[in-house]
A protein has these predicted regions:
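C-terminal accessory/regulatory regions appended to core domains
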Residues: 1-172
């Protein structure tokens, strides 16, 4: 195994956004079994340390590829785009975000579970569509558009978590 391989190469996968999670899970277990530190328990210290480094590297790669948002960020980073550094968003999207946040705040204050659930469903639907669009942009690749859409999805994932928190608080 080669430490310079990207996450996709570690698992023998093509470098693309669309992945079969069941296949990724299978490959993870297969690769992890080859380098698991327990297999090296009776080996010299250097080999045990190397096995631990490999296990850590494989776990990190798996966690990155398993999550759609982190997989998209990683793909863009392989193209030289660091999404976290750039913060520009369209005025239209920022207005939409403000409207969403106001609606969540009002529903949270009123403990309106039905309203929060409706907001959650609408946001999830919109995000599903955006994830499909993101996949096409990443596989094209249209890294500029993909980076913009990924930044929007990062905001929306945070908002979704806020709605989940508000629902938990309202139902408690």
């Amino acid at each position: 195994m080669d430490f310079t391989q990207d996450h996709f190469a570690l698992f023998g996968l093509p470098r693309r956004y669309a992945l079969d999670n069941a296949e990724l899970d299978r490959l993870y277990r297969e690769v992890q079994a080859r380098v698991h530190p327990d297999k090296f328990a009776h080996q010299p210290d250097a080999e045990r340390r190397l096995a631990m480094q490999w296990a850590t590297r494989i776990n990190e790669a798996y966690q990155t590829l398993r999550q759609p948002l982190s997989r998209a960020k990683y793909l863009l980073s392989l193209s030289g785009v660091e999404v976290e550094r750039e913060r520009r968003m369209s005025a239209e999207f920022l207005m939409q975000q403000m409207e969403w946040r106001e609606a969540v705040a009002e529903a949270r204050a009123a403990l309106a579970v039905d309203e929060l659930e409706a907001l959650h469903a609408r946001l999830k639907k919109e995000m599903r569509e955006q994830y499909l669009k993101l996949a096409a942009q990443l596989d094209a690749p249209d890294v500029g558009a993909a980076a913009d859409l990924l930044r929007q999805l990062m905001f929306q994932e945070k908002l979704l978590a806020e709605i989940d928190d508000a629902l938990a608080a309202a139902e408690a």
